[in-house]
Amino acid sequence: MAKEVSLSNTSAGGAALDILGLWKGFDGTEVLKGLSLNVPAGQFLSIVGRSGCGKSTLLRLIADLETIDGGTIQIDGNPLSEISGEVRMMFQDARLLPWRTVLQNIGIGLPNPWQNRARKALAEVGLSEHADKWPSQLSGGQRQRVALARALIHRPRLLLLDEPLGALDALTRLEMQDLIESIRARHGFTVLLVTHDVEEAIALGDRVIVMEQGEIVLELDIELARLRVRSSQAFTSIEEKVLSRVLNSRNAPSGDDCK
């Protein structure tokens, strides 16, 4: 369990995200088709759908890792070109540099002195004692905690999570879900989570959307108290509704899921 060490005294809360008429294609295939989406500041939005529906592409466009073919993305009313450092993204692969220590991985790109900030971020994810270890000495769950600390040190107002827990075992996954939820509650940043796990989406999200072939086909507010009882009738009712829509989705075009 992570210690209650927080960077929140320097956090700026969540950012509002507004997407209008977003289009993106790869090699002649339309991946996003005029998608529009509004996410209020501080909301946790879960995004689910079959492989190839455009979920990861959407996050990469918000992170400015891909160019937009059409439409607009604004954060707090400002275009992405005017945003600096307020958006951070986590992937399924922690992407740690093997030749740098855990602490050095967290401090990459920061001006000196960065060590104290890095240690606070590491403490917040419960890994203070691993600061001087190499990434190869960590478990998969620990590596993802380091990746989370690396995002937190930049005090993001919008955190994008692209299947960060997908490769973890069931117990570690639950622990990471609890950690993400507790840190998000303290900092108040906005979160977009892409996941294939509908239960995870409902457990963490304030709202869930289902994507199909580059479009939003279902949108539900999750009006359940936290911490959520996954075995409750209300929880399973939402889960069944989302699962039914995902399972009835049309087959997605090939080639997008690697985007």
From Swiss-Prot:
Enzyme class: translocase
Molecular functions per Gene Ontology: ATP binding; ATP hydrolysis activity
Subcellular location(s) per record: Cell inner membrane
Binding-site residues for ATP, renumbered to this chain: 49-56
Keywords from the UniProt entry: ATP-binding, Cell inner membrane, Cell membrane, Membrane, Nucleotide-binding, Plasmid, Translocase, Transport
Its membrane topology: Peripheral membrane protein
UniProt catalytic activity: ATP + H2O + aliphatic sulfonate-[sulfonate-binding protein]Side 1 = ADP + phosphate + aliphatic sulfonateSide 2 + [sulfonate-binding protein]Side 1
Disulfide bridge partners, by residue number: none
Enzyme Commission numbers on file: 7.6.2.14
Domain ABC transporter: residue ranges: 17-238
InterPro entries, A to Z: AAA+_ATPase, ABC_transporter-like_ATP-bd, ABC_transporter-like_CS, ABC_transporter_ATP-bind, P-loop_NTPase
GO cellular component term, pick one: plasma membrane
Family designation: Belongs to the ABC transporter superfamily. Aliphatic sulfonates importer (TC 3.A.1.17.2) family.
Function comment: Part of the ABC transporter complex SsuABC involved in aliphatic sulfonates import. Responsible for energy coupling to the transport system.
Subunit structure: The complex is composed of two ATP-binding proteins (SsuB), two transmembrane proteins (SsuC) and a solute-binding protein (SsuA).
Protein name as it appears in the record: Aliphatic sulfonates import ATP-binding protein SsuB 2
Species in which this protein is naturally found: Agrobacterium fabrum (strain C58 / ATCC 33970) (Agrobacterium tumefaciens (strain C58))
